[in-house]
UniProtKB/Swiss-Prot annotation:
Keyword Nucleotide-binding: yes
Gene symbol of the encoding locus: hisS
Stored NCBIfam families: hisS
UniProt name for this protein: Histidine--tRNA ligase
Species of provenance: Pyrobaculum neutrophilum (strain DSM 2338 / JCM 9278 / NBRC 100436 / V24Sta)
MF (Gene Ontology): ATP binding; histidine-tRNA ligase activity
Length: 417
């Protein structure tokens, strides 16, 4: 038999297989991030991978809708694979309105986007994130940003910057310039500020109907600044919003390293459901964008009919793993027991049980390799100790142990295990 053709032996485009070293790295990252969320009182939640298409598309924006994996099920219903967890969480909250608020949930799970695959970007990938539902306080914004930063640091990020903005501040700026009606095209342009030259970003705005002088002023207003400078800038736009920012900056100053934070009015986030504070993280020498979040105070009302403030963030786990260099975790076998014949098998099983009960991983030779081949095998798979159960050793009540890391060999009585 010739087997499958080569292209069918590989996963579908944009997907990946997780072999043990990569999977253990993923598990390590999951443990680091989950520990942070749990320490802040967030509890883990999971939802179906498949959602009603209407639920996914309700407030996603056309660009994201175009990336949804969607199909008809066998009953003819339009369904799709979730592209993030914020929308499913909003749906879950919509029929659990009696939950005590604020709700603090987190997740570490797979999501799907039918996007063009790139280095470090897959169509099936993992997201870690939190959702805080039921609070409009700037303390909630500060808490979510604090969890975000502590998660980055727990993951191993040392060189990073978190850029913060507020969609309300951008809207106030557009209103003062008389171009609020061009909001959507301006947001699209600002979202591409660090991907395209200045002229092209301005062209996107002018091609959408924004006068050239206004487009230039919007671009200039989106320059980075410190949080303290941002308070003054936002106060000039709107006193109420400026007061909110004064409180937020004060709370952040007590909780996080503020030198890692910058205010940047070009950070608007690509999803249409954001309504207030938004933020993104850039990690490492090449400033990889690894995640972000913000406020979505109108989203839950779309599903439940009840106005409910909410905010959260999501981190692209694979991108973060690449940025911090956590891409492989080798997990060697603790013990490999080699026996020469079936007579020693009961002794091998008994010893393996003792070692496993003590928390060790143990494999027993299956009887298909001679000692030389078994030795080559365990070196390839990674093993700490080789235990040899020969007939003469068993007669003396001992086993021979090879420490493969120190390259030492010694005997040990079976009674001492």
């Amino acid at each position: 038999m010739s087997g499958l053709p080569e292209h069918l032996r590989r996963p579908p485009r944009g997907m990946r297989d997780w072999l043990p070293p990569q999977l253990y790295a993923l598990i390590e990252m999951e443990e680091r991030l989950s520990k942070v969320a749990e320490s802040f009182g967030y509890r883990r939640v999971e939802t179906p991978v498949v959602e009603h298409f209407e639920v996914l598309a309700k407030k996603a924006g056309q660009e994201v809708v175009n990336e949804i994996y969607y199909f008809k099920d066998k009953a003819g219903r339009d369904v799709g694979l979730r592209f993030d967890m914020t929308v499913p969480v909003a749906r879950v909250i919509s029929y659990n309105l009696d939950l005590p608020r604020p709700v603090r949930w987190y997740y570490f799970t797979k999501v799907f986007r039918y996007d063009e695959p790139q280095h470090g970007r897959y169509r099936e990938f993992h997201q870690f994130g939190i959702e805080l539902v039921g609070s409009a306080s700037p303390r909630a914004d500060a808490e979510v940003i604090q969890v975000f930063i502590e998660a980055l640091e727990a993951a191993g990020a040392r060189d990073y910057v978190v850029k913060i903005n507020d969609r309300r501040a951008v809207d106030k700026l557009l209103e003062s310039l008389g171009v609020l009606q061009h909001r959507d095209v301006i947001y699209r342009a600002l979202d591409k500020k660090y991907k395209l030259p200045r002229e092209q970003v301005v062209d996107i705005m002018t091609n959408g109907g924004v006068p050239i002088d206004k487009a230039e002023r919007i671009y200039d207003a989106s320059e980075e600044m410190t949080l303290e400078e941002a308070v003054d800038a936002v106060l000039r736009l709107d006193a109420g919003l400026g007061s909110f920012y004064q409180k937020l900056v004060g709370y952040l100053a007590t909780a996080v390293p503020v030198d890692r934070l910058r205010f940047d009015m070009s950070i608007v986030r690509g999803l249409d459901y954001y309504t207030g504070v938004v933020f993104e993280a850039y990690v490492g020498k090449y400033r990889l964008a690894v995640g972000g979040g913000g406020r979505y105070d109108d989203l839950l009302e779309l599903y439940s009919g009840v106005k409910m403030p909410a905010l959260g963030f999501a981190i692209g786990v694979e991108r973060l793993m690449e940025a911090v260099g956590l891409e492989r975790v080798e997990k060697p076998l603790d013990y490999y027991i080699y026996i020469f014949d079936d007579g020693a098998y009961p002794h091998a099983v008994a010893l393996a049980k003792k070692l496993r009960a003590a928390g060790h991983s143990v494999a027993i030779e299956l009887g298909e390799k001679n000692l030389k081949d078994a030795f080559e095998y365990i070196l390839k798979v990674g093993t700490k100790y080789l235990i040899i159960m020969g007939r003469r050793e068993l007669e003396r009540g001992v086993v021979k142990i090879r420490d493969l890391q120190r390259r030492e060999e010694f005997e040990k009585p079976l009674a001492e295990f």
